[in-house]
Amino acid sequence: MSNMQQKTDVILIGAGIMSATLGSLLKELAPEWEIKVFEKLASAGEESSNEWNNAGTGHSALCELNYTSEKADGSIDISKAVKVNEQFQLSRQFWAYLVKSKLIRNPQDFIMPLPHMSLVQGEKNVEFLKNRFEALSKNPLFQGMEFSDAPETLKRWLPLIMEGRTSNEPMAATKIDSGTDVNFGALTRMLFDYLKTKNVELNYKHSVENIKRTKNGLWEVKVHDMNSGKIEHHTAKFVFIGGGGGSLPLLQKTGIPESKHIGGFPVSGLFMVCKNQKVVEQHHAKVYGKAKVGAPPMSVPHLDTRYIDNKKALLFGPFAGFSPKFLKTGSNLDLIGSVKPNNVLTMLAAGVKEMGLTKYLIQQVMLSHEKRMEELREFIPNAKSEDWDIVVAGQRVQVIKDTDAGGKGTLQFGTEVVSAADGSIAALLGASPGASTAVHVMLEVLEKCFPSRMVEWEEKIKEMIPSYGISLTENPRLFQDLHTSTGRTLGLNEKETVHN
C-alpha cells in the first residue's frame, strides 16, 4: 500500500476527545461523509484525554476562582465564568442526546455528580469569595450555591480538610451540588466505539508525518503505519488536527498563513494520589483553592474526589513540571523543533516577558516529596507522607502568539481553533478549559469550516444541543428545563440525592 493515494471526505488526526466529538457531530449532520482517524498510539484517549492525564473536572466555573477576576473597585467580573458555564452546558446537552439516542450507554461510566467547592483562607480572600458568591448567585446558571465562613459548617462540608486545623485564620467556602467529575478517557473510548459502528475508519499506531496542499486544493496527509512500517498517502477535502500538544508541529507543516507567528510552551503536570482508601472515603468534593500571588492560572491547587474505573480516588495538585516534549509520549526535540523563522521573535519575546513563569517552573521542578506534602497539608493538615504517591499527568502546550492587547509573544491560557481562510483545515491548540468545552469548540470548527452548511444543519444541531445559539443566562426557564432533563438522562439527579 506504500505511496498509494487514498481519498476520503474527512481526516481526523488524533483519537482524543476533540476528534471524537467532531466525528460524532459530523456523523449526525452528514452521515454519508467518509471519515478516517489516525492515531499514533495503540488506542483512543491515551494522551491528554486519558483519565490520569487531566483533572477530570467538568469545568463550569462553579469553583474555579481564576474564572472570576476582581476589578480595581473590588467588584467581581463574572463574564468569563458565565461563558465557561454556558459552554459546558452544550457538552452536557450533547452527551445527554447521545445517551437518549442509545448511541452511547452507561453514562455513570463517564460522568458522576460531585459537589464543586471553593476554599480560601485569610480575611482578604474571604471577602473576595463572599463578593464572588454574591455576584454569581444573581445568575441563574449558579443557583443553589451556598457560602459559609462558619467553622461548624466548614467541618460538616469538609471533614478531612478541617480535621487537625490549628490556625485561627478566617476561612470560607462555597458549595454547589450540581458539579460533576468527568472521565474524559472513558467518554472518548465510548465515542470512538460508536463511530466504529458508523463505518468511521479508525487507524491506531498510525503516525502523521506531513500535511500538504495538493494542486487540486485537497489536503494530502502522509502517514507512517507503525504496524507494517509502510508509508501511506491519504487525501481529504477537510482535515482536523486534534493531536493535543502535537497539533502545533503538524499545523506548522501545513504552511497556511494562519499557522505563522504562533509558538508553544510545554508545561507538564504532576498530581499526588492517595493510596489509603480510608482517607479517600473521608472526602467527597472537588475543592479549588486560590492561586498564590504571581503564580500562573494553571497552578490553582485543588483536592479532588475522582471516579476512575468505577472506583473512588483522591488527587491533589497540580504541581508543574518542565519537559521539552509536546506530548507525554513525545520527543525531547519537540520544543526546539517548533521554533521557526516566522515565530522565533514571538518565542523570544515570550521568554523575556514570562520570567515569572520560568522562575515558578524551576521552583516547582526542584520540589521534593516532603515539600509537596507541605503544600498538601495546607489542605489536609493531618496528611501522612506514606499515604501519597506522585502521578505524572499529561503535557499541556500553552499557545504563544502576538496580540493587540498583550503585544509580541503573549502567553495564552485558553483553547484556540486555528483554521485556513477557506475552512479546509483546522487545528485545536491550547489547554484549559479544554475537554469540558469540547462541544462548543467543535461547533466553532463547524462554523468556521462549513459556513455554507450551517443553515442546513441548524435544525439537527438544535435537536442535539437545544441551547445552541441561545444565552441560557437570559433564558433561565430554558436552563432549568435543560438542566433537569439532561441530569435525568445522564443519571445525575438521582445520584446527587444519594451522595448528598
Swiss-Prot record:
It catalyses: (S)-malate + a quinone = a quinol + oxaloacetate. One of its GO terms (molecular function) is 2-hydroxyglutarate dehydrogenase activity. The keyword Oxidoreductase applies. Pfam families: Mqo. Pathway: Carbohydrate metabolism; tricarboxylic acid cycle; oxaloacetate from (S)-malate (quinone route): step 1/1. InterPro entries: FAD/NAD-bd_sf (IPR036188), MQO (IPR006231). Keywords: FAD, Flavoprotein, Oxidoreductase, Tricarboxylic acid cycle. Its EC number is 1.1.5.4. It is an enzyme of class 1 (oxidoreductase). The keyword Flavoprotein applies. Coiled coil: none annotated. SUPFAM superfamilies: FAD/NAD(P)-binding domain (SSF51905). Its cofactor is FAD. It comes from the Bacteria. One of its GO terms (biological process) is tricarboxylic acid cycle. PANTHER family: L-2-HYDROXYGLUTARATE DEHYDROGENASE, MITOCHONDRIAL. Belongs to the MQO family. NCBIfam families: mal_quin_oxido, PRK05257.1-1, PRK05257.1-3, PRK05257.1-4, PRK05257.2-1, PRK05257.2-4, PRK05257.3-1, PRK05257.3-2. This is Probable malate:quinone oxidoreductase. It comes from Bacillus cereus (strain B4264). The gene is mqo.
